[in-house]
Regions:
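Short beta->alpha connector loops
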Residues: 69-72, 92-96
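A glycine-rich, often tryptophan-bearing local segment used as a flexible ligand/cofactor-contacting loop or short
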Residues: 37, 94-150
Length: 150
């Protein structure tokens, strides 16, 4: 099981290298604000998310806020995505409200960043913009008519 956590930590670090590699950028000393979204997943998010948080915080470059979005809390999940430099998704669950989806699309269109971890590519099979953001949606009834799928 520890190997799985090491793989998750390595994957997160790999995806976030662009944020760490701007040594000449005057903003390189500022903290990178991350919103980690989890709370539903077919993988063990309760163990994986803390490893991601620890890995990011160990660099001294990230401030991580965690949004645990349980089924019964979907209606209350309306974050101000614009407060964050990157959204880290370890979420594979029920669809967000249309209002939250719209807000998220606007965040991405405005230059926001998204890192999708493993099963998070499965989370919204019918949300076209999300599947365009991630480049490849998966599972949950998608097929070749929906575009590329795994």
């Amino acid at each position: 099981m520890k190997k799985i956590y090491l793989v998750f930590a390595s994957a997160i670090t790999l995806f976030l290298i662009p944020f760490l590699s701007h040594a000449d950028d005057h903003e390189s000393t500022s903290m990178i604000k991350v919103l980690l979204v989890d709370g539903q997943n077919n993988h063990d998010w309760k163990k994986c998310s803390p490893v991601m948080i620890d890995t990011l915080q160990a660099t001294g470059r990230f401030i991580v806020k965690r949004a645990i979005v349980a089924k019964e809390e979907i209606a209350d999940f309306k974050p101000d995505f614009g407060q964050y430099d990157v959204i880290l998704s370890n979420y594979n669950g029920d669809p967000w409200l249309k209002e939250t989806q719209h807000s998220f699309v606007q965040y991405i269109k405005g230059g926001g960043n998204l890192v999708v971890v493993h099963a998070a590519d499965n989370s919204f099979p019918k949300w076209k913009e999300y599947n365009e953001m991630i480049g490849l949606g998966g599972w949950k009834g998608r097929n070749e008519k929906d575009g590329p799928y795994v």
